[in-house]
Amino acid sequence: MKLFKKLAAAVLVAALALTMVGCGAGGTGSAFDLKNEVLNVIEDSYCADHKVATHTTAMDAAAAALIEKAAADEAAKDDDVTVKDLLRNNGTGNYIAIFMPYGQLSTELMQYLYIGEMEDTLDKAIQYIANEGYYNNSDTAVKIGSPVIGEDDSIEIGAATGKIKDKNYLVLLVKKAEA
C-alpha cells in the first residue's frame, strides 16, 4: 500500500510539472504563442479604444515572406547591414514593420514586457508616421514603401517569426485597413 501511495504521488507531481511548464510546439512559451499574444493584445487594445485592428492570414503570410526574403538576401552576410535595412530593402507594399529579436522568454513577466514593448512601438510608429527622424532612430520599426496610417484608422495586422542574421525575430506587419 505504501508503494502504491508513493507511486501515485510521483505520478501526480510529474503531471503537475508537465502542465505548469508546457511542452512541445505550440505550448506555453513557444514562438507561436508569443506571436498570437502580440496580435491578441493589439486587437484588444484597439477594441478598448473603439478602433479596429484585424488580424489576417494574408498579413501573416506577408510577414513570413518578408522574413524569408530578408534572411536569404546576400547582404545579410555583411555585418554592417542591419536587420532594419534587410526588412526595408526586401519588402513590397506599404507597411510598417515592427521587429524585435526574442530568446527563450521563459517567464510570463518577460513575455508581458516583450509584448508591451511591441505594442508601444506600434503606437509610436503610427503616431509619428510622418516623422522620418523617428524611423531613422528606431531600432525596432521600419517603413516599407509609403504607408499612410492615422491614429484613428482601422488597421490590418499579421506576424511571423523566423531567423534573420542568426537571431530569432518576431516581425509584426501593419497597414491601413482597406475600406
Identify the role of each PLM range:
Residues 89-179:
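A well-ordered secondary-structure block
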Residues 18-22:
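C-terminal motif of bacterial Sec signal peptides marking the signal peptidase cleavage site
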Residues 1-11:
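Bacterial N-terminal signal peptides that target proteins for export
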Residues 26-98:
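Short, well-ordered surface patches within globular domains
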Residues 2, 14, 32-36, 179:
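Short, low-structural-confidence N-terminal segments
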Residues 11-12, 41:
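A periodicity- and composition-biased signal for non-globular, repetitive helical segments
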Residues 9-10, 72, 179:
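Short amphipathic alpha-helical "recognition" segments used for binding
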